[in-house]
């Protein structure tokens, strides 16, 4: 057995299966496509589900991949053990109804013993206990020692996930120090102790489990195998953990260099070193696939990983931002197999650094909150911090509960761990229930996805708006039909069509389908999971049957408007890169016949000056009337020419490149104008943030842009008429009016204060005494919170001893304030409790200290009733 580097193992594996007529596919994105069952790709076969289910035709019946994966289910163990990690690569070879056990078992043995040259006396094989077929192949088609084959039960060697495709599996294991193992019991014990490790799982998907629990044989069984690259590397490099594998150790060494810590000298520091080493790999790959830090979904996973790693950097004494610098080491060791990392290097580093800087701000804010909690606990003579507060620090400020515990321990305070765990459990349940229910294989179980894969629709809509074709499929009421008639709605699929199906942010076409005997309105056009073009129709007249000849005609005016908006989106993208910066990446778009919407990565609002410049550049390119050209070329050639590709798109070898003069060049399958002049005009309507690090621009073109400008002009004219001036004088007139209003408001506030002062005497004249405590309470109209507090201060100071509770109805809201002198607090008065009871009458709430509290209410009509309860509440508190 010769030592092999991780990258070398990957290449040898893929080359081996290419030699067995497999198509090598690049790794799919970590962002699942058309699979709502997953947040992130977490297994080698996950992106291939549509091929296994028959929903899509695979590019080849034999495929091999090395798939990047992220799993965070056991993130708490990462770092604490030397084998857990969030990022890993899974190598696999797959058969979609082609070869089966008789081929894959000998191939697996050949690669293991002849390519990797693992010693046969250190290898073991396990099979499902009832799989005699697999046993026979292992014994007769390989030279494995039969004594080294063990039959295990369903728990170990049968792959199933609920209902649907499933089957037995066979695994290959390596002995890492268990001595000679002779029985299955000894084997299981050694495996549990990690002395024998499984490194390759061959799944024989040959059954379909139904709701009755029956295992029905599949007509075309599949092969799905998985070999963890990092685990294989530990064997080939004779190291104990994934953190000692060559490419990963390079990252670990850099962490040690930055922190000044030595690995394997301090158990606590080792945990932090491993966490940072693992997490930066996941972080780098996730951002390269277009995921950005946020508070939900995939973005939340990324933020959690990034902040956890950053916090452990502080634990190691790294006080500056540092994670972005580790990215270079990850990329250097991976870019040959993942070229997108090199292409997006600077972008990845910028995202990481910005999030690190945000966390620095957050952790400081979190410390302030924690210090406030500590004071509150001590003031109330408690010894425990409530679980919900500890969870708030964890969830909102990124404070690991261990860090909170450590700080509290120094203050002699503990955490309500049960309450914290309850909050954590509820959050996980919320996250789990929020995920859309779907079958395991990831595709919605709808008739639209069950259309025969052999039926294909040729799209001819780039240069035609009307074509003749035949009806291939009719769907009505979730059933395949032979015909559909007037008054019904359904779906029609034809063999060719000019209708563009919604894709890439561009809305689907509308129009009509007709012949001499029928007419249907096409109200939408979409694709199913296998790419079939679906015309959603309403039958207006007559009826149509399968194989009928029809004419399909797109609504030309609507299509033209969509074209204008789509081409304008491309020009906008290029203009944003030019003005805002080359970190701008498209993260989403929407194009219809009314407007366009463009989402892009940027970390602050686009300034007014920048927006004006972007708008100016777009209109300048429109006025140039640049030719818009489309060309199909190889993906690599397109990238070399500078064509912009989107993060989450998986492109074929040949791609369609859309160029607008020399200004814009993008990979795109949508419809466009033939020259930019046809767009006419471009106008930005709005710019706003839609998520952390994501901005959105909405805009209109052509006549819609003119309508927008006309609307704005009309508003200006109406405003000028109201202010009785011309449009040139409008700004000066408005400024004058605003200043005048502010002066009037000051006068009004001064009058209110005078009224409040007058109310002071009346309130002091109506003081009540309850159990020896003076109580002043009243409802005062139309004064704000500051004035209400000032009035309360004056009354309390005049009373010298007593309680003051005031309420006010101000601008439709209810305000309350309560104040008490120290001697009344000693008698049991607590303003926080008083204000809570009183405000609840007016539909509000609040609280505060024993000597001062304030609150709000929602129902002004209940103000008087609320104030009437003051005396009763005070009476209940006074000792």
UniProtKB/Swiss-Prot annotation:
Q: What is the lineage of its organism?
A: Bacteria, Bacillati, Bacillota, Clostridia, Eubacteriales
Which Pfam families does the UniProt entry name for this protein? DHHA1, tRNA-synt_2c, tRNA_SAD
Q: Which InterPro entries match?
A: aa-tRNA-synth_II/BPL/LPL, Ala-tRNA-lgiase_IIc, Ala-tRNA-ligase_IIc_anticod-bd, Ala-tRNA-synth_IIc_core, Ala-tRNA-synth_IIc_N, Ala-tRNA_ligase, Ala_tRNA_ligase_euk/bac, DHHA1_dom
Q: Which GO terms describe its cellular component?
A: cytosol
Which cofactors does this protein require?
Answer: Zn(2+)
Instruction: Quote the SMART domains the UniProt record gives.
Output: tRNA_SAD (SM00863)
Q: Which gene encodes it?
A: alaS
Q: Which UniProt keywords apply?
A: Aminoacyl-tRNA synthetase, ATP-binding, Cytoplasm, Ligase, Metal-binding, Nucleotide-binding, Protein biosynthesis, RNA-binding, tRNA-binding, Zinc
* Annotated positions binding Zn(2+): 566, 570, 668, 672
GO MF: alanine-tRNA ligase activity; aminoacyl-tRNA deacylase activity; ATP binding; catalytic activity, acting on a protein; transferase activity; tRNA binding; zinc ion binding
- What is an annotated GO biological process for this record, any one? alanyl-tRNA aminoacylation
Q: From the Swiss-Prot or TrEMBL record, state where the protein is found.
A: Cytoplasm
The domain section of the record reads:
Consists of three domains; the N-terminal catalytic domain, the editing domain and the C-terminal C-Ala domain. The editing domain removes incorrectly charged amino acids, while the C-Ala domain, along with tRNA(Ala), serves as a bridge to cooperatively bring together the editing and aminoacylation centers thus stimulating deacylation of misacylated tRNAs.
Q: What is this protein called?
A: Alanine--tRNA ligase
EC numbers listed for it are 6.1.1.7
Cofactor binding summary note: Binds 1 zinc ion per subunit.
- So which domain of life are we looking at? Bacteria
Catalysed reactions listed for this entry? tRNA(Ala) + L-alanine + ATP = L-alanyl-tRNA(Ala) + AMP + diphosphate
Q: What does it do?
A: Catalyzes the attachment of alanine to tRNA(Ala) in a two-step reaction: alanine is first activated by ATP to form Ala-AMP and then transferred to the acceptor end of tRNA(Ala). Also edits incorrectly charged Ser-tRNA(Ala) and Gly-tRNA(Ala) via its editing domain.
Q: Which species does this protein come from?
A: Clostridium botulinum (strain Loch Maree / Type A3)
- By its UniProt entry, which PANTHER family does this protein fall under? ALANINE--TRNA LIGASE, CYTOPLASMIC (PTHR11777:SF9), ALANYL-TRNA SYNTHETASE (PTHR11777)
Per the record, the similarity remark reads: Belongs to the class-II aminoacyl-tRNA synthetase family.
Predominant place of localization: cytoplasm
